[in-house]
Amino acid sequence: PTWKRVFSARVFRDSKRFQTSYEDRVVKVLREYSDMPDKDVMTNEQILKAYGIISYTQTLECKGTVLCRTDTGQTFDTGDFPYGAVLNSQTMEHAKPVNIAKIRRIMTIENKANYENMSYKEDTLYIYCHGFFSPKEVEFLRELTVLAAENVEFLHWGDMDYGGIRIFLFNKDKIFPGLKPYKMDCESFVAAVTLNAGRTLEAEKRKKLEQMNAGELEELRSSILEYGMEIEQEMLV
């Protein structure tokens, strides 16, 4: 992988030229011809990341007690930061989780406001999802599945829309096989619509929802189509 600004400096002799003048056009082409199943809901950064161009903003945010060890043998505990720990890409590259003995629940949360609203609990690990996890994040987080005791609960709380369903399915398939949806059922959806927290479903998203296999979230998919509405987590804060 190459840092975005290093790539730009090497190609254009200007570290910001790629981002300001070419990034959107390059991503448009990559998105159009890519065979990645989630390309339509991936951000520019995620598309570029898949092709080896990375930015400095690749970080993993979490709240909870995870003991990690670097490849030089040093250890650190994310539990020392009860208001949230932030691991940059190089930390994820050179460290991995080695102990989560206190954790009984692991929850990925799609949106920042909802993540920030969750208070530290010694037996719970909250992970800010931000969308689709990068390959580096996926590799790092998979270690949690290996370390987790049999009674650890894996949950995902995300938007009740096309993208939210895709993110849940991605996390379940790529990271946490035992993942279950949290507050993403039909009852939660109807309650949110009743509170006027929904927004109108776009025609293009309706087509995609009609064609998708939503797995465990089939009832949610059907409800979105029935009501013609979708819900973002932030509307429920």
Region spans (language model):
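Short, conserved loop/helix-junction motifs that constitute active-site signature segments
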Residues: 146-149, 175
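Acidic beta-strand-to-loop metal/phosphate-binding motif
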Residues: 151-161
